[in-house]
């Protein structure tokens, strides 16, 4: 069975794992209510998407 010839150093290990991280959210203000929401997703606070009401929200501010 294959085994590593040498111990992997902390630096080498951290360099390899450098790309493993959480992606940042693309937040944009909702044009209808102004709250931050994810891009290309229905606004959870008002239910609008692309300028029209898509989802009925119970506690709409407008």
UniProtKB/Swiss-Prot annotation:
Q: What GO CC terms are in its UniProt record?
A: large ribosomal subunit
Q: By what name is this protein known?
A: Large ribosomal subunit protein bL32
Q: Which InterPro entries match?
A: Ribosomal_bL32, Ribosomal_bL32_bact, Ribosomal_zn-bd
Ordered alphabetically, the record's keywords are:
Ribonucleoprotein, Ribosomal protein
Per the record, the coiled-coil ranges are: none
Q: Report the family membership.
A: Belongs to the bacterial ribosomal protein bL32 family.
Q: Which GO terms describe its biological process?
A: translation
Task: Supply the Pfam families for this chain.
Answer: Ribosomal_L32p
- Name the Gene Ontology molecular function terms of this record: structural constituent of ribosome
Membrane-crossing residues?
Answer: none
């Amino acid at each position: 069975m294959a085994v590593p010839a040498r111990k992997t150093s902390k630096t080498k290990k951290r360099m390899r794992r450098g790309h493993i991280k959480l992606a940042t959210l693309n937040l944009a203000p909702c044009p209808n209510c102004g709250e931050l929401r994810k891009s290309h997703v229905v606004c959870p606070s008002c239910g609008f998407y692309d300028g029209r009401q898509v989802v009925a929200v119970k506690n709409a501010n407008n």
